[in-house]
Amino acid sequence: MRKLTVVTLLLASPLAWADRPIQLPGSDIEQSLPRPNLPGGDVRPQAPRVSTPAAAQPQQLLERRIRLRRIEVAGGGHYPIATWKPLLEPLTRREIKIGELVAAAKAITRRYQDDGYLISFAYVPNQDFRGGVGRIMLIEGHLREVRSAGDLGVHQARVERWIERLKAEQPLTRASFERFSVLMSRIPGLKMDMVLNPPTTTDGGAVLEMLGKHEMVTTGADFDSRHGNPRGLFNATLASLLGHGEQLQFSYLYPPGDDKEHYRAWNYSQLLGDNGLQLMAGYSHYNASLEDRVVIGPLQYARKRENERVSAGLGIPVLLRRDLTWDVNLRAYTVDDSSRYDLLAPATPYSVKLRSKLRVVGVDTLVQQFAEKQARAGSLAVYKGLNAFDAQSTAPAKKDFTRVLGFGAQQNQFGERMQGVANVSFQWAHDSLPDSEQITYGGANFGRGYPDDQATGDKGWGASYEVNYSFLWQNRWMNQLQPYLVVDGARTHYNADGQPGAKLGSGAVGVRFSNRKQYVLGVEVAKPFADRAIDNDERSPRLNLTLSYQLP
């Protein structure tokens, strides 16, 4: 653990406190907590598997030539019969192959699909074309039957309400079914596999097969060594005990380490209604007696920090498709953050306490896009501090600040086993920010060759790119070995005059071991090549160990 941190814009002597308060670079606590060593993080698709097999056409002698006087369209009803006249009438004016009639049926199917009717189609039934009459059958698919297995538990009533909505839609649309499937994946504590079988009868009735599993309690932990000491963030989640789509998660940081860090957080969410609206609330508390010493010339200070945060929000799903989701979140939070600096050398009884009480509102939007070989995610957020409700801060930090932040990520699959992952992040602010609102880079957060709290600032950006390759085999305990290479970098800046920024740059090589279900163990060696690490003046390579597990 590093012993001394030199800060340039600080108090020159204890007597100067009245005229020039201490303004230290701080960190957003949650940015430096242990996190999983996963490529791309939350970019991976989470929607349940849904199969919609294509309807089979009857076998025909496609090259046989026929002469038709009339083509009858049976079934359907969503489109007027006249809709198909421009497509079918030319086939009655000349001799055609049966394959041309089948092609016309496929064109009608494409029209249904292009208009979003997921399991509707047209086909040419077996017939003898007697009297020069041909027939095309339209099947407008709708949900007729649901076969469920497994344990839906307390979610049974919610699922049945959604099913009734789908059954009422004739023909069934892709938009409704995909929204349903994504909403199902967002129910806390419910895991669902679904298969939608297309209609096999002329009435268009389709069968949906569902296999559900209700998991009320899950536990997990993330360990890493990037902070200088091994640390673990333990999580326990209770999901949908009452059937209201509620979830309560408790997180705890252990062991305290040399900095005597104590962090605990409670986060609660609950679905409101059946359309995906979600209420969110959270509370966290952090306190630490930091081992680092703040050095100003001959003076040394010890720092103790305490941070308490209360938050609330409303999640609004705007667009839910299997290939694209768009969510908007309205948020509000309060922060009570204090830092106490005790003079150690010279040994004079003196201390300074800085405190900020923030009242913040904000809005953020998240877009995720999924394709067969690519996944993308992007988010943009704006937060505004309020000069109200007893808000306060120590100059030059502003309590009525405005900050804008965002991130983007993209995963690309190259072949069957290779993957590339790009990540970018930024924060911008024109104001000097309180410690709790500043951006922090280092460790897994765009600075693998550095400790996780290497660089802070009012504004900055980070970027990384990873290439990995997976070796897969069948084994219960370990079935994936994934070596990877990462290059990352970051910049931070302060808006107050005289405070230096930071430049991070590092490269890392590592390997992940996993059973692709419960755990990921990561081992990597990273070397900085920009600023020197604050705990290593020689830019020596750093060994990082991470472990994440989840039960069940």
Residue ranges and their predicted role:
Residues 107, 179, 231, 263, ...:
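Transmembrane beta-barrel architecture of outer-membrane proteins
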Residues 192, 217-219, 241-248, 274-280, ...:
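Repeated loop/turn-to-beta-strand initiation elements of outer-membrane beta-barrel proteins
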Residues 215-226, 234, 245-256, 264-266, ...:
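Transmembrane beta-strand segments that form the barrel wall of outer-membrane beta-barrel proteins
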Residues 236, 511-513, 518-520, 539-552:
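Outer-membrane beta-barrel "beta-signal"
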Residues 37-60, 64, 69, 75-78, ...:
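Outer-membrane beta-barrel initiation region
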Residues 259-367:
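Transmembrane beta-barrel wall of Gram-negative outer-membrane proteins
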Residues 224-233, 253-263, 455-458, 462, ...:
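Solvent-exposed loop/turn segments connecting transmembrane beta-strands
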Residues 340-495, 531-537, 543-550:
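C-terminal outer-membrane beta-barrel translocator/porin domains of Gram-negative envelope proteins
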